[in-house]
């Protein structure tokens, strides 16, 4: 029988916000389809939403400067 895996640790929502005085700033990009409260994962070359599957590719600075 295979060994049981440990429980996954969830992320704290407070890690996605920065509070300064009376203002709150989001540190991660928000999904435009799902709306506020659903953050997009940042990968090497893209942003992806885990809820709806929406994906945005990052602009490649290397190819733009060569043109």
Swiss-Prot record:
Q: Which residues bind Zn(2+)?
A: 31, 34, 49, 52
Gene Ontology BP terms: translation
Q: Pfam families annotated for this entry?
A: Ribosomal_S27 (PF01599)
Q: Which terms are listed as keywords in the entry?
A: Metal-binding, Ribonucleoprotein, Ribosomal protein, Zinc, Zinc-finger
Q: Which GO terms describe its molecular function?
A: structural constituent of ribosome; zinc ion binding
Q: Which domain of life is it from?
A: Archaea
**Which cofactors are required for activity?**
Zn(2+)
Q: Name one GO cellular component term.
A: ribosome
Co-factor: note: Binds 1 zinc ion per subunit.
The stretches annotated as zinc fingers (C4-type) lie at: 31-52
| InterPro entries in the cross-refs | Ribosomal_eS31, Ribosomal_eS31_arc, Ribosomal_zn-bd
Listed under subunit, the entry gives: Part of the 30S ribosomal subunit.
Database matches in HAMAP family: Ribosomal_eS31 (MF_00777)
Family, similarity comment: Belongs to the eukaryotic ribosomal protein eS31 family.
> How is this protein named in the record?
Small ribosomal subunit protein eS31
What organism is recorded for this protein?
Methanococcus maripaludis (strain DSM 14266 / JCM 13030 / NBRC 101832 / S2 / LL)
